[in-house]
């Protein structure tokens, strides 16, 4: 890296006239952002045109698409895991390569299998009735979700996971409220366009977030990758080709500026964030001095109608009563 930096410096010193000016660099960046925005805008319009078509697909049609996604994953899975290992400087043949398989192709395949099993087994909305439950000391109901299959028991030995219900929700209410996205007849559903701002730590997280929006919430998705995962774009596009081909999903790379632009797009009805609190705050409150001013006035800058946040949810709640008044969080 030092040698490369020295060579660059030497070249610049030898040909000062050819070095781009600050204005030229800015213009180049602006042109790049403008092109990226134009491409993203075109994709958002295609998603918007297809949103109701997706919302009205039946469970059987979604199962067929998920099976097609599984088939599409297989030819790229090995290169996907190998490329991720190389980027993280994991030696070829190292046991650590297994982590890239588990947090990449396997995670997506497993999610597809679980959604397929759920959609095929769902009778109305009664699937939750088959899951083990227990009552906590405080009276809340906990539903066991992992392990659920034989593969869970083999690969996740000793790991258990439960969903703890809100206080006051008994078993009857749980059965009635499960699979809400499928409660409305397919012909009566209305679609929405969701922006998923992909996390950067685990490659599979944005993929699973995307399936959440598509299959659980009936929303088509523009997935913007975290820049650290831009190199995985070809693999994600190949794996999700059955959904991308029908304009139910689009995947784009891009920096924070493109993400900020997409957050303000008129066609984006919902934003899904999995990441740092700083990302959340930049979306809701703005940046720099504007953030301090907006937070001081308890008035966010042009907030989206809905913001779904995971790890940054506590930051959202600290804003005060404002979010209950203007920014309902579903789920």
Task: Map each language-model feature to its residues.
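Conserved C-terminal structural/oligomerization subdomain of aldehyde/semialdehyde dehydrogenase
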Residues: 2-3, 27, 50-66, 187-190, ...
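Conserved A3 ("GATE") glycine/threonine-rich loop of ANL adenylate-forming enzymes
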Residues: 131-141, 145, 256, 276-278, ...
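N-terminal Rossmann-like NAD(P)+-binding subdomain of aldehyde/semialdehyde dehydrogenases
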Residues: 2-178, 225-227, 239-244
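ALDH superfamily catalytic-core signature
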Residues: 16, 29, 227, 237-248, ...
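Active-site-adjacent "gating/activation" loops or surface patches in catalytic cores
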Residues: 161-204, 208, 215-217
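Conserved residues at the C-terminal ends of beta-strands
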Residues: 197, 255, 274
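PLP-dependent aminotransferase-like
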Residues: 205-257
